[in-house]
Amino acid sequence: MARRMPGPTCCGDARRNFCDDLHGVRGKFPRLAIATSTDLFHWKKQGLAFRQQLDGRFCRDFRSKSGSIVCKREGDRFIAEKINGKYWMYFGEFGISLASSKTLVNWEIALDKKGEQPLLVAPMRKGEPWFDQETTESGSQAFITGDGIFMIYDGMAPQRPDLALTGKIWSAGQILFDLKDLTKVIGRTDRDFFHPEKDYEKQNVTKGAGGANNVTFISNLIYFGGKWRFYYGCADSRVACAVSTK
């Protein structure tokens, strides 16, 4: 029997590769969940990603979203790849952490010696117009390259005087993790490479939905037809695609 969750609910910000994830929202707490499919039309919801760890500690009033599973690229496909016998996933909302799994369904957060969740990618320091000075969040799927594990991430700043934008502004940066130590950051952009410019990226068009302005929020990266493309949310009300040949 299905159980109705109290408060507003939704599923959103899915990341798709050869495995999948999404996050569900119960009231004010987003929580990472897993869904699987063999044909991309029919989906099975597998439940909350961290439900088995520490007797469900990370299912009760614990914010988790935006899972980016580490993959390898084979042609146009991104396939979840085991490293040291496990699958790995970067995730987080106000900072990026790491989790592992043997099944791609049940996940465990990599905790420190005190049993706490460390942030591998924290917001940039305050005092300058950093694009991610308030929030860092996993964006595209992470994938293995010759230099390390590459991932696009989303960052938020309370204002961007360099762009003449005010309010919360969501932009995108790039990060590189060490393949031998997945907790180690070996490269990170100081400036965003993608930010709100178009009217549909700056202005939310959904009246009464509580959406935000000034948002370019990247969720998926694909390689197709010899070009890199990513899909991204625009001002919490539309979806667009950006293309690069580099």
Label every PLM stretch briefly:
Residues 1-4, 12-134, 143-211, 225-246:
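Beta-rich carbohydrate-recognition and catalytic domains
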Residues 10, 141, 220:
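Short, surface-exposed charged micro-motifs
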Residues 207-209, 216-221:
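Extended, compositionally biased non-globular segments
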